[in-house]
């Protein structure tokens, strides 16, 4: 029964932002569940090594380049077949900056990377999921799209991640008749290349621990269970939701 609920039985899955951190962990988890995984990111050397480990395929893609985004799904389809699972992990922001000082180019790039590119990938994956009669899209957001975080000003990033939850709800309603589910996972703070400095600094680490009810630090492995649940049949009646995985941060 458990294998039926969480097994992905040869379904093609595309994971963006997969060269390291959460994206790589998601790719490993889906592959372990039986998916045939295509990994996409800018860092092609890391990507190739991961794809070899998983028995999948690597496709280099810069999500700030619309031409590369528009062809990513077709490049995956040529090598593995059309994706039935899409996990939009890639994202990020230029750095903490007061809203009134954010440069227009920075705002544009942040919105493109975190919202526009995932939307476009959903659009290009859509016909393949329709043809398969089913599909699961999991967008990876952040608690920054749910609440403001004092001391870490990131307005354009917060706007993009909040927009991702709105996009998720809208696509879920539009595409439900095709058997396509669309959900978002919104992680809180967890150890990664990007956040390591927060954990290495005694003061910021104490701040994280003080504001997180669960009494331990999270790793990427603490986030991927929600993604696997939403990607497979265990979550077959869940759509349009933003699942917050934050150790209780937003429940305070």
Describe the residue ranges of each PLM region.
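Short C-terminal tail/terminal secondary-structure segment
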Residues: 2-5, 93-96, 228, 239-252
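Substrate-binding pocket helix/loop in short-chain dehydrogenase/reductase
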Residues: 97-99, 103-111, 137, 208
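A conserved structural motif in NAD(P)-dependent oxidoreductases
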Residues: 212-223, 234
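Short, small/polar-rich loop/turn modules that mediate ligand/substrate recognition or access, typified
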Residues: 176, 181, 238-240
């Amino acid at each position: 029964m458990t294998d039926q609920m969480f097994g992905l039985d040869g379904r093609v899955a595309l994971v963006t932002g997969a060269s390291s951190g959460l994206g790589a962990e998601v790719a490993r988890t889906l592959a372990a569940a039986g998916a045939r995984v295509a990994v996409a990111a800018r860092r092609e050397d890391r990507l190739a090594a991961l794809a070899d480990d998983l028995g999948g395929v690597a496709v280099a893609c810069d999500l700030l380049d619309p031409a590369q985004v528009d062809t990513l799904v077709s490049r995956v389809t040529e090598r593995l077949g059309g994706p039935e699972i899409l996990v939009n992990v890639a994202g990020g922001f230029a750095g903490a900056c007061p809203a009134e000082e954010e440069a227009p180019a920075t705002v544009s790039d942040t919105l493109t990377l975190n919202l526009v590119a995932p939307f476009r990938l959903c659009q290009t994956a859509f016909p393949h999921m329709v043809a398969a009669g089913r599909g699961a899209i999991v967008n990876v957001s952040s608690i920054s799209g749910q609440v403001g975080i004092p001391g870490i000003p990131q307005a354009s990033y917060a706007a993009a991640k909040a927009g991702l939850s709105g996009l998720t709800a809208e696509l879920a309603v539009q595409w439900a008749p095709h058997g396509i589910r669309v959900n978002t996972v919104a992680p809180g703070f967890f150890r990664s290349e990007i956040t390591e400095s927060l954990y290495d600094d005694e003061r910021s680490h104490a701040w994280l621990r003080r504001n997180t009810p669960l009494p331990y630090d999270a790793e990427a492995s603490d986030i991927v269970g929600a993604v696997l649940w939403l990607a497979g049949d265990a979550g077959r009646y869940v759509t349009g939701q933003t699942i917050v995985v934050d150790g209780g941060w937003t429940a305070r």
